[in-house]
């Protein structure tokens, strides 16, 4: 286990690249990026150093192909190996595909933040999902 995994938080990033066809976003080196999964600090205080917030982004053209699940599962593995104890996902409540993805990967709904965001004049709720490494076996 890493003594202070939070110090290495920004280094946990997984990128899916496609060499076979034109699907994905064009990357800086000409590669086709299908998606990205990463972690960021959950809180700045040392007591929360082993908890991180995850984000998964999949190119529109690559959705529905298992890219998000592959990215998230690999991110979970790397985060666990890096010494993180808990992953948090904050998802806009209407993003059903991200909610399904996190539930499929073993995340549990732990709360809802009411009207914490605003987009195009509409208030948005955010649901919070959590995955605790020690209570799951992959």
Please identify what each model-predicted range represents.
Residues 50, 83, 123-125:
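Residue-level preference for beta-strand/loop junctions
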Residues 1-61, 72, 132-136:
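Acetyl-CoA-dependent GNAT
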Residues 31, 81, 121-123:
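Alpha-helix termination/capping residues and helix-transition junctions
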Residues 38, 88-91, 103, 108-125, ...:
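Conserved catalytic-core motifs of GNAT/GCN5-like acyltransferases
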């Amino acid at each position: 286990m890493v003594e202070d995994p939070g110090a290495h938080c920004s280094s946990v990033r997984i990128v899916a690249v496609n060499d076979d066809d034109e699907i994905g976003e064009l990357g800086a080196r000409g590669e086709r990026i299908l998606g990205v999964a990463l972690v960021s600090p959950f809180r700045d205080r040392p007591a929360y150093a082993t908890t991180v917030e995850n984000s998964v982004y999949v190119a529109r053209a690559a959705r529905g192909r298992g890219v998000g699940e592959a990215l998230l599962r690999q991110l979970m593995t790397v985060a666990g190996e890096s010494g993180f104890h808990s992953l948090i996902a904050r998802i806009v409540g209407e993003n059903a595909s991200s909610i399904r993805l996190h539930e499929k990967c073993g995340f549990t709904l732990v709360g809802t933040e009411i009207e914490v965001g605003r987009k195009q004049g509409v208030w948005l709720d955010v649901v919070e999902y959590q995955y605790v490494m020690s209570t799951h076996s992959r």
